[in-house]
Amino acid sequence: QLVAHPVWATQAMFELNRAQALNALYAEQDRASTSAMAATVNAWFERDAELTEMYHSIKGGKWNRMMSQPHIGYVYWNNPPANIPPVVQTKALAQPAVADMGVSVEGSRAYWPATGGLSLPEFTLYGEATRTFTVYNRQGKAFNWSAKASQPWIILGKNSGELLADTPVAVSIDWSQLEAGHHEGTINVKGTGWGGANIKVTAHKPELTARPVSGDFIEADGYVAMNASEAKVKSTPNGSWHKVAVHGRTGQAMSAALPPYSSLTHQQAPALEFPVFFTSTGEFPLTLQLSPSLPFDEATGIKVAVTLDGEHVATLALPSQKDKQAWAQGVMDNVKELTTTLPVTKAGRHRLAVKALTPGAVLQRVIVDTGNLKPSYLGPPQRRAP
């Protein structure tokens, strides 16, 4: 009633929506596994109904009908008349069975043979250690496949086999074989069809004069992400920052503790300091994710300053509470974003700081886009040097 049902019901809805998204992707990529994923969607839909009935039977029906409100199939604010089975797609297979290879790569909807060239996301020195491509069947008969890399520094988790269904293959880089710079290679995958699929592999090894120190937030895969709760607090006589547990998108946030109605310069303000290691230089978009908050003093608002290596970069303020639409959106997202530009003139270690100029700021995350930040609702994972 209080623990199991919320966990199980959340799992059912997550798995249902995930399977529905994969079903749509598999159909677009012409995978034979499209129908199997449709069956998975329907199984989780049935699981949700089963959980509802279980809840209604607790204590001889003590809470009967409490979970009866429809919650699957929303298309606008009001609930549908009943839980609507999700729309799924299936794929008919040839009879008698034949084999027909398809190949896809992570991070892309494209697939071979419909798309001539495929590319894995770029490997970076401190980024994801492995990328994945998938060899799959577009029909119902098993076939043999093989994969070969054009460069010795491209490492394949497996290079051949027999498959009937989807087979993911991990790809990694032997960085010890690479000099500093940008490198390219290909992976040729053969199975059925003429010529096979060619997958482009790129790797960037920056030329660095120093290495990150343990605990540094590292630029990887085109971004730097930093959880505020892991910053170093630099208190001043004028105030400090305190951790707020079980709050925000990362589970913890940092709240500025200043006297009411105070208004400080960035030299006077308490700071959250982040040791950051950049592998590139440029003018990078920086985003602060703060919790929606109302100011103690509408005249001064909620303001923070951003500094890099002690130099002032920008002063940012949360929008006025009079902007009701912006406030409503912030509450729904549980975050308000403030943006500025961060000038990084040299690669290596830097000290990024966020300083509370007025009371009320609750910082969740800091994200710097160094050129390849992908769109997402919750943002990318952070990386720290071991």
Regions found by a protein language model. Give the residues of each.
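Extracytoplasmic
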Residues: 107, 117-386
